Amino acid sequence: MKNLLSMSDAKNEVNAILEIASGLKSGEITEKPLTNKYIGMIFEKSSTRTRVSFEVGIHQLGGTPLYLSSKDLQLNRGEPIEDTARVLSRFLDGIMIRAKKHENVEELVQYSTIPIISGLTDKEHPCQIFADLLTIKEYKGDFNDKKIVFIGDGNNVCNSLLLAAAYVGMDMTVACPEGYEPNEKIYTLAKQEAQKTNSTIKIENNVNEAVKDADVLYTDVWVSMGDEDEQDERERIFKPYQINNELLSQAKDDAIVMHCLPAIRGQEITADVMVSPQSAIWDQAENRLHAQKAILYHIFKE
C-alpha cells in the first residue's frame, strides 16, 4: 500500500496495520521509519484530532511534520493541483491531506511521486476507521459474530466503516432516515465483500429494530461541515436517531458506544451516554494517534 485514500486501498492489509497499531501502543514496536523524513499536512478543513494526532505521531516516528493550511498555499490562488503535487514531491517524503473533495486527493495522487494519506474527504475517512477497528478489537477481542450499528447520516465515516466491516467479517447495519443512505457504490461493494467474510451489511430505517443485539453503537454529527444550510431540516429528520439511554438499553448489555467527534451533545448523542461506563469514545479518540502512526509505519517501512 503506497497511498491511503479509501479503505479499499488497504483491503488486504487491515489486520496487519491493526497489529502494528497495537505494537506501537504497547511499546513493543520502537522503530522509527520516519527518521529524517518530512511529512506535509495539508488542511482544507479545520481539525483537532487529525492534526494533533498526525503531528504528534510523525514526531514520535522520528519525522518532521509541516502544517500547510490551504490558504497559505498557491492552491488558494488557483495553482493547479498537478503543479502543486509535482513540486511538493520534490520537497517532501509524504503528504497527509484533509480535503473538501475526494476528487482533489485523487488528482494529487495521480501527479505525486510520494505517498498520499487522506485525513478525510467528502467521500471517506479511512484514518478514523483504523482507530475505530483498533478500539473495537480492544473492547471485544475480535470482529467475528460482532454487530456494529452506525446511527445517523450515511456520511464519509459511514462509507469507510462499511468497507472495513466487510473486510474484517463484522456485521454492520446502517440506521438512517430514508434519503440519507451511504454512498450507493460503496454500499454495494461492501455487501459483495461481506459475502467473502460471511458477514452481513444492511440498511434499516427503523433505529429501534436496527440496534437489537448490537455490540457497538456508533454515531456522528447530523450536520457535517458544508451542510450547515440544511441544519434545521436535518435536526428535525434525525431527531429519532439520537443515541440515548433508552436506545442503548435495546442493544446488548455490554454494548459500547462510539463517536468520531466532535459531538454536539444533546443532538446525535446525550451527554450522559458520552461519559457513561459503556462509552468507548475517549479510548477511540486516543487511538487516532496509534492507528495513524501504524498507517505511516506500514507505508514507510515497506
Swiss-Prot record:
InterPro entries: Asp/Orn_carbamoyltranf_P-bd, Asp/Orn_carbamoylTrfase, Asp/Orn_carbamoylTrfase_sf, Asp_carbamoyltransf_Asp/Orn-bd, Orn/put_carbamltrans, OTCase_ArgI. Disulfide bonds: none annotated. L-ornithine binds at N156, D220, S224, M225. Keywords: Amino-acid biosynthesis, Arginine biosynthesis, Cytoplasm, Transferase. Its EC number is 2.1.3.3. It is found in: Cytoplasm. GO terms for cellular component: cytoplasm. Carbamoyl phosphate binds at S47, T48, R49, T50, Q74, R98, H125, P126, C127, Q128, C260, L261, R288. One of its GO terms (molecular function) is amino acid binding. It catalyses: carbamoyl phosphate + L-ornithine = L-citrulline + phosphate + H(+). Pathway: Amino-acid biosynthesis; L-arginine biosynthesis; L-arginine from L-ornithine and carbamoyl phosphate: step 1/3. One of its GO terms (biological process) is arginine biosynthetic process via ornithine. Reversibly catalyzes the transfer of the carbamoyl group from carbamoyl phosphate (CP) to the N(epsilon) atom of ornithine (ORN) to produce L-citrulline. Belongs to the aspartate/ornithine carbamoyltransferase superfamily. OTCase family. This is Ornithine carbamoyltransferase. It comes from Methanosphaera stadtmanae (strain ATCC 43021 / DSM 3091 / JCM 11832 / MCB-3).
